[in-house]
Amino acid sequence: MQTVETLNEGLKRAYTVTIPANDVAQRVEAEIKSIAPQVRMPGFRPGKVPANLIKKMHGPAIEQDVLNKTVQDGVQQLLAEQKLRPAMQPSVELVGGDYEPGKDVALKVELEVLPDVPPPAIEGLKLERLSVEAPTDEIDAQIKRIADQQKRYDDAKDGHPAVEGDLVVLDFAGSVDGVAFEGGTGTGMSVELGSGRLIPGFEDQLEGIKKGESRSLNVTFPKDYGEKSLAGKAAVFEVTATDVRVPGETKVDDEFAQSLGLQGLDQLRELIKGQVEQELNGLTRTHMKRKLLDQLAAGHDFPVPPSMVEAEFGQIWAQLEHEATHEEDPEAARAEMEKDRDDYRAIAERRVRLGLLLSEIGQQNGVEVSAQEMQRLVQQAAMQYQPADRDRFVQYLQQDPMAAAQLRAPLYEDKVVDFLFDKAEVSDRTVTRDELEAAIEADDDTIGKGHVHGPGCGHDHHDHDHDHDHAAPAKKPAAKKAAAKPAAEEAPAAEDKPAAKKKAAVKTEEAAEAAPAPKKAPAKKAAAAKAEEAPAAAPKKAPAKKKAAAE
């Protein structure tokens, strides 16, 4: 194989690679011999079909397969001989277009290489850890929230008119144009006024109703109502309130905690305190990590492959486009995005540079994700799928190294960050939640924040065509879907009663709901904030495109 370098400019490289026709011919003959035992042809015993007949019948397909493999091997040999580390999938073209049997194979190979990352300066890092003690009032508020979710109702006084929050128990009979319809009649249905569970206007017309009172409710089914025969139609419901109940106050005590499957109130408080502390510790780490990356970015400046920056920018932009579609005014959101296009490109460049830097730090210092850690990641990810699909998901990861790299990358990055935390000089300061959140928000406002993006991060820099959609094979199992909202919540149903309280199961569900949800950042800030949470890893060798030979 002959190699001629045609471009060496910055990180860009280009080569002409010539593979002698004799090498291809020898590979074709070897392939024919290897498949001959499996070829079946009328008139010949199995494995005894002459090579010339095999070539006559299957020659073009064999030559194409051999050519593809020859091109891949040629590119691999080029990368090894020239000691190249591709940033992205090399571009491989046949010089002159189609391959002609009997002639040399001439390839044009173009690529960008990873830069030589300068020795990372990781000595003398100084970080401040902003810590927040779990506030008692926040713990109390979370417990009250749980108590409020465990609603109980007491009998209302005689003559009490139902108001929002009250529970009205109804017998009902619905009709359209005077004709009863299926599912429109029932008894003992409980309706919490103001819950919005029933069709528009139904609950509103129950306000003020008293026990024993009957009313006629005029409503219109929504045009997108699940039962097509009722969609958009006007209906009349004759209802009678058989009972009106008022919310009772849930007393927060040992008995309440025991109803959740706990030993007592002290255990509930400890459980909630632990959840609040976990969330606050996460905020502390987020702030520290961003400050760490700021120092690394400020102390290291080296060229990064434009193709990696462009691919990273494409991902950022796609995420912003997705978020814009959910804004009240998508066009205005897109216009705002366009104003900041250059800023987002700067974010992309920072991501790539930090990714390469963290990857280098991890490799130099022996940071690894162990087989046991990877196994736990796979098991956790598999739980997102239906039980019947979990084995297929695991097989998918085993067959697709890039999918496995995507799964592994965040943990690898966290381990590199933890390594740097251990090396840094860390000072502690106790602050309030508001002060910590304000510090994080100030980071969000800083242009240039971005998740770190390096080789092996799950974005394919050189192992396949880099289109960044990362679509899984057709047989990749689908993730679990949320259960559809039952039709009973859109119209009265005979058996629509409040669910009974759960005991032990409530323990984890209520505790999970007790933790406050993080505030949602505006689209621009969210894109920058998310930046600090992505992966870096070591580069891999790059096979050539299989389709290159056919192009």
Swiss-Prot record:
Composition skew (Low complexity), residue ranges: 513-541
Source species, domain of life: Bacteria
Compositionally biased region (Basic residues): 542-551
SUPFAM superfamilies referenced in this protein's UniProt entry, alphabetically: FKBP-like, Triger factor/SurA peptide-binding domain-like, Trigger factor ribosome-binding domain
Span of domain PPIase FKBP-type: 165-250
Localization, UniProt: Cytoplasm
Chain intervals with Basic and acidic residues compositional bias: 458-472
UniProt keyword Nucleus present: no
Residue ranges, annotated region (Disordered): 442-551
GO cellular component: cytoplasm
GO BP, sorted A to Z: 'de novo' cotranslational protein folding; cell division; chaperone-mediated protein folding; protein transport; protein unfolding
Catalytically driven reaction(s): [protein]-peptidylproline (omega=180) = [protein]-peptidylproline (omega=0)
Major place of residence: cytoplasm
Keyword tags: Cell cycle, Cell division, Chaperone, Cytoplasm, Isomerase, Rotamase
Entry EC no(s): 5.2.1.8
Record-level Gene Ontology MF annotations: peptidyl-prolyl cis-trans isomerase activity; protein folding chaperone; ribosome binding
Enzyme class: isomerase
InterPro entries the UniProt entry points to: PPIase_dom_sf, PPIase_FKBP_dom, Trig_fac, Trigger_fac_C, Trigger_fac_C_sf, Trigger_fac_ribosome-bd_bac, Trigger_fac_ribosome-bd_sf, Trigger_fact/SurA_dom_sf
Family: Belongs to the FKBP-type PPIase family. Tig subfamily.
Function of the protein: Involved in protein export. Acts as a chaperone by maintaining the newly synthesized protein in an open conformation. Functions as a peptidyl-prolyl cis-trans isomerase.
Domains: entry comment: Consists of 3 domains; the N-terminus binds the ribosome, the middle domain has PPIase activity, while the C-terminus has intrinsic chaperone activity on its own.
PANTHER family for this protein: TRIGGER FACTOR CHAPERONE AND PEPTIDYL-PROLYL CIS/TRANS ISOMERASE, TRIGGER FACTOR-LIKE PROTEIN TIG, CHLOROPLASTIC
Protein name: Trigger factor
Organism field: Rhizorhabdus wittichii (strain DSM 6014 / CCUG 31198 / JCM 15750 / NBRC 105917 / EY 4224 / RW1) (Sphingomonas wittichii)
Gene symbol of the encoding locus: tig
